[in-house]
Amino acid sequence: MELKINDLCDDVIVNIFEYLSDNDKMNFMFTNRYFSYLIDKTFYNDVHHYRLVHNLPFYNKFKKIEYYASTNNIPNGITHLVFNDEFNDNVDGRIPCSVKCLTFGKSFKKPLKPGTIPFGVEKIIFKSWYNKSISGGIIPGSVIHLEFKTSRKLSKGDIPENIRHLELICNNQSLGVIIPRNVKYLKIGYNILLNETTLPYGLTHLVFDYNFNGKINGFIPETVTHLEFGNKFNQPLEIDDIPSNVVYLKFGTDFNQPITSKVIPSSVKHLEFGYYFNQPINRGVLPQGLISLTLSCKFNQILEPGVIPDTVKILNIYPSNVCPISIGVIPSRLTHLNIVQELNQILDQTILPETLTYLRIPHCYNHPIKPGIIPLSVTELEFGSNYNQVLEIGTIPPNVNSVTFGTKFNQPLSKGVIPNSVKKIRFGFEFNQLLKVGDIPYGVTHLYLGNRFNQPLEIGVIPESVTHLDLGYCFKQPLEIGMIPSSVTNIKFSMYYYLPIKRGVIPDRVKHLNLNYIYTGCDPDFIPKSVTHLQFDLGYNFRLIDFKIPESVIDLEISRAYYPIGPKIIPNSVQKLSIWDYKGEVTDDIVGKNVVCLRVSPLNYRGYEKYLDLGIEFKTY
């Protein structure tokens, strides 16, 4: 017997829905009239904004409701509560018991009382410094994630024992009785003093913030696997200072201390040295089993063969003057090689192992690269800033799927130079060559034409496979229907495109459209009805919006809208709206029915006070 999906009982379908996003659930239900009745029987697990769902008859089926509070009038049922950055009012008795995630904005300074934050809240973030007391159970025991900065000294019990994730800056030098013993992730700042009781056993992720520069003395627990030092840390390290289970180790900007044998434990797989590190590295210092190594800008030491373990697969070298690399220095199984600045030798098999999949050619390198030099295994290729040589067929290997040209590259292309395997092409600042049909191979999906590009395009130059197109900064050539292929879904126009755009030039499949400047002679309906994300600039001539913004747009950004925005300009579909330069009154025509995020000039703050109870996220920066 043939089983149809309609034969499945409702409970089975609802259970399947638990593995889908809410958007996928809706799409599934609307494919069949039979399933549409499940809308109010299904639970929705993604985060949804209160303004978009609170009037729905199945509102109680949404498990996560987000609300941005600009006043202390907060509706019940909110689970994700964010106080906007301008908010600084009393919240006693105002936070619903349904809240699970709570964020206080940058201006919040009011004192909190025990019970103000209800038990049940699991995550609290203070975005700015909070210098009022949190003693006496102000942070409830249900909280497992806390981000908190204060210039006060904390006492034992201020931070609940159940905390698992803690990001803390306070005025205590000793934190032994402050940090709960259950913490797994810890980020701490200021120059605290470590002792044997400071850090809890069981901690796995430890991040020292910017100012820490204290002695380690072996006080980091053995359970730590992820360790990051802040930019100010520059203390000598002894054996056992870095625990034997650390897998990820990162040093900050200032660290420049000798590294001797066994200081870095054999467990480390990912190692990153900071900006000023410039110490000799002897053979045997770096652990066997290391996978990723980063040497930063000031490193200027000769690397002998065998210093970098053969297990390393990712190597990042940032110095401006790399010492010559001899045979045996580069591991034979390397997959990612990123030499950023300068290399005083010719690229050959000494430097380029046959296992490479990612290669960045140094910025200062400008020697011809013949076919066969770059290994066939490379799939992602970046040329440095100075590279400006004619490319032969075969220079870019046939397996490359992403190629980025540097700032100065400005050479003509011919068919076959860029292989058919390439999916993404990014030209650099100076590129301004006439492109012919076939120069960009069919199969390319992402094409960035470079800031100086200003050449006429004929139909077929941009292949029908392209979905993401950036016309660069200077492009100002007339566009006719068909020049931008129908496959394109994302387009960015240049800052200087002062030409009229006819209806049909922008294909009907485009969803993301960045116009920068809109010329006055455009057809009123030149923006297709498929666009969901729209950005445009009205220029300095104080013009009105005299073209239609489609009802499909949900994310809208308008620059230099100096005249008042009247009715029927902003469609009701818009959920995120940015009118940064707008000086007019914020009205119902702007806020609409569905806007949940509004970005306006700080000068306009008083202009939207009457909308503060809508739960909208207001941004003034």
Curated annotation (Swiss-Prot):
SMART domains, alphabetized: FBOX (SM00256)
InterPro entries reported for this sequence: F-box_dom, FNIP, LRR_dom_sf, STK_FNIP-Repeat
A matching Pfam family: FNIP
Repeat among keywords: yes
Domain F-box residues, every copy: 2-47
Keywords from the UniProt entry: Repeat
Ranges occupied by FNIP repeats: 87-128, 130-171, 212-254, 255-298, 299-342, 343-386, 387-430, 431-474, 475-517
Domain of life: Viruses
PANTHER family: FNIP REPEAT-CONTAINING PROTEIN (PTHR32134:SF92)
Protein name: Putative F-box and FNIP repeat-containing protein L60
Source species: Acanthamoeba polyphaga mimivirus (APMV)
